[in-house]
Amino acid sequence: PNQKAKLELMATEAFLLFAQDLSGGILNPNMIDVNINVVPYRKDTNMLLASLTENLDVNSFFDEHIPSSNEYNALVTELRKLREISRNEYWGDLVPADVPLEVGMTHDNVPLLRKRLSKMGYPVYQTHPRLFDEELDAAVKKFQEFHGLNPDGVFGKRSIEAINVPPKTRLVQVLVNLERMRWNN
């Protein structure tokens, strides 16, 4: 009986730590950098236990304690995609940074750009593989906007740097941003 009680206490403690990590993050921001002035909100364990006993549905309990913003949910969706991509494939060959690409140009780098954008989920159909056409321009603008770049359609140095980031690096960036959002939950 004593062993069973000890196991139950350990399971409860692990459950509460997990709930706190979900709601307030895993890492202490000051351990990463002393200049980070964020104090994550840690939910009181008594409040968490009371919340669980009121609502015996564990899924609802966790839903109640994780960040619920659209941005957080979008990052979780992106994380799932990136995990799948990182396991099974990559985004194609890198786009060389030798020349900026824009509408109306014909260049050997355009097929690489089309392929990489397509693998990243931006629909781009090939009418003339080497031609940077209006359709490719629309996909480039969406890519630029999604990555916080000026959506001007010119695929220059910053856009090329952004598209050439490997999926595993993007995955780490998403994980870091999810953690930051939990700190502010």
Q: Where do the language-model regions lie?
A:
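Auxiliary tRNA-acceptor-end handling modules of aminoacyl-tRNA synthetases
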Residues: 1-185
